[in-house]
Amino acid sequence: MTQEVLERSIQVGGRTMTFQTGKIGKQAGGAIFCRYGDTVVSAFATGSAQPREGIDFFPLTVEFEERLYAAGKIPGGFIKREGRPSEKAILSARLIDRPIRPLFPEGYRNDVQVVAQVMSVDQDCASDITGINAASAALTISNVPFEGPVAAVTVGLIGDEFIINPTVEQSEKSVMHLTVAGTKDAVMMVEAGAQEVPEAQMLEAIMFGHREIQRIAEFIENYRLEALERNLAKPKQEVVMKQMPEEIVQAVKAFAYDKMDQAVRTEEKKAREEAIRQVKEEALAHFAEQYPEDSKTIDKILEDFVHKIVRRLITVEHIRPDGRALDEIRPISVEVGILPRTHGTGLFTRGQTQVLTVATLGAVGDEQILDGLGLEESKRYMHHYNFPPYSVGETRPMRGPGRREIGHGALAERALLPVIPDENDFPYTIRLVSEVLESNGSSSMASVCGSTLSLMDAGVPVKSPVAGIAMGLISEENHIAILSDIQGMEDHDGDMDFKVAGTSQGVTALQMDIKIKGVSREILERALTQAKEGRLFILDKMLSVIEKPRPELSPFAPRIITASIHPDKIREVIGPGGKTIKKIIDETGVKIDIEDDGRVFISAVDGEAGENALKIIQALTQEVEVGRIYNGRVTRIMDFGAFVEVIPGVLGLSGKEGLVHISQLAHGRVEKVEDVVKLGDDILVKATGIDKQGRLNLSRKEALPNPNPSSNPNPNGITANRNPRNS
């Protein structure tokens, strides 16, 4: 049987991206085998035949499956198979979800599942970018009514040059890591981390990426047309939208629209929610007898009224639900140092959004080890975001962090990363935890502000303070409104959530999600400009409370002492089976981390304990210098000489000793060793050399003054200090 396969390629960033269909996954709605360099991602898109009943949302799920065989690895542990998705996989799934979600028909309620499976990894060709393009192509050739295609690229910036899909080496030099996704017509999604890049340059980078996206999107569209000709793509599913009965719509509108309009204008969130709830209850009770089977329909009509009223108020009347101007920021309250024994705290309140961020400083060994499909790395700065149900007045089971929490934590982490001090200047592991205590929108950006406050309160020498703001967009007919510091209702009923974080000098992080079919350059430019104004306002509020990092660390934070030893001496500090280093830790109560290059990090809450540990390590690794005179102690007497310890032992371990041959004890002839020295004597000796076996040779004779028979009654120098030396 002949197998029909369609394979086409396009050059992206100087490398070949190949799309293939017809060979694998033929029972899926659409299947694409995508190779970019040596990275291979297979994407499968499948939709259900019928809509899911009784829901008011689009049931789209996106899975990003990492297989360790893709990197030539076997999973650890007893089970030896992949478990829960990694944080990287969750963030990659979100990257795919966000640009494709707005491109399904409004009101479409069929289940759709997109699975991107990483099968081979080339570190220079990112699997998440490959996954977005593969998923878009799979949806485009499937029967799912997807209004794409979309495409995605990463943009780097080295000097003044933008680079599409930079390699690992280029990424290390780049001051920007920007992911852009979009259609041929508009930008759909932006995700960025940057080193204080100016807004104008960030905008140019987005548009530079979009020009490459247009080329890839057109390629995918042409690929679909060719696949259709060969029966390798499927006709799109016909979408039948459930229409609201016009009679009920008009009846509900006549009874409830004006009441709902007044309810929406209530400024305080909880009072507004209660007012809207009362209008709904009143309407449902009023129509219970007339339309007894249509309570869900009536509830949906009322929700649509809220949506339309919010949008009309903002775009036509320029009135926001809480009464603010379009560019006005909610009242801000800032506090630091509110927890007594933590290392640093920042409480940031903006309107009805409140976040407490706590900073904890740890030893080098507290770094997070990342061992996924990429190279094994460690992370010394991390941010974790928690969004409990009580923050929005709800109850639900509290389990582990969800995708949203992981995504928000990663965004806030990325925003502060450029201002975290270098390890050489501040050798601490830093963990931030943001607890959302109250939320009415923009909690991730409040976490950014809280992070800056907690770091400065902890005495971390951040390079610049960072603040964040969430911008919104409502586009209604010929009216466009860009909102600063959006709250929950504006996010829910708006068209864009554009989060911007940065310093006074430039942007450090961006994230844009939209619900419409894209945004133009003009809108992006206006949003970035307005966001900068808001960010500078917020920074002023923060700096009025804590202007710069505290000069001293918290008394409860560990003190880290750094030292450097020769790499060959590492084994002497560690000892057989780790015995020596365990003794040091038990004796002093410190934490010790040793890098392969010989850097030693001693972490101790008690500074004296850290100094004691350092002295022990210095004693263990101290080298005997040939030619130097030492005050040593006689440890053994032999017929042929005396063994002398020149560097004392520590922790019950032997020190460094060498042999003073009998011929080197004195200037004259010595018949018997005991005539010159006794066990336990402290004597001056000179290190004269180290033989091929690593044995140390010492000489007492060379440490003595030159003999002068006329003035020295004891030319053999047969004297010794019988007093025990200080050890």
UniProtKB/Swiss-Prot annotation:
Key words, A-Z: Cytoplasm, Magnesium, Metal-binding, Nucleotidyltransferase, RNA-binding, Transferase
Enzyme class, first EC level, given as a word: transferase
GO BP, sorted A to Z: mRNA catabolic process; RNA processing
Primary location: cytoplasm
Required co-factors: Mg(2+)
GO cellular component: cytosol
Domain S1 motif: 627-701
Gene3D superfamilies, alphabetized: GHMP Kinase, N-terminal domain, K Homology domain, type 1, Nucleic acid-binding proteins
Matches recorded under PROSITE patterns: KH_TYPE_1, S1
Localization per Swiss-Prot or TrEMBL: Cytoplasm
Molecular functions (GO terms): 3'-5'-RNA exonuclease activity; magnesium ion binding; polyribonucleotide nucleotidyltransferase activity; RNA binding
KH domain span: 558-617
Residues that coordinate or bind Mg(2+): D491, D497
CDD domains: KH-I_PNPase, RNase_PH_PNPase_1, RNase_PH_PNPase_2, S1_PNPase
Cited SUPFAM superfamilies: Eukaryotic type KH-domain (KH-domain type I), Nucleic acid-binding proteins, Polynucleotide phosphorylase/guanosine pentaphosphate synthase (PNPase/GPSI), domain 3, Ribonuclease PH domain 2-like, Ribosomal protein S5 domain 2-like
A Pfam family the protein falls into: RNase_PH_C
Residue segments, region Disordered: 698-727
Function summary: Involved in mRNA degradation. Catalyzes the phosphorolysis of single-stranded polyribonucleotides processively in the 3'- to 5'-direction.
Family matches, as NCBIfam families: polynuc_phos, PRK11824.1
Family classification: Belongs to the polyribonucleotide nucleotidyltransferase family.
Protein known as: Polyribonucleotide nucleotidyltransferase
Species assigned in the record: Desulfitobacterium hafniense (strain Y51)
Source taxonomy: Bacteria, Bacillati, Bacillota, Clostridia, Eubacteriales
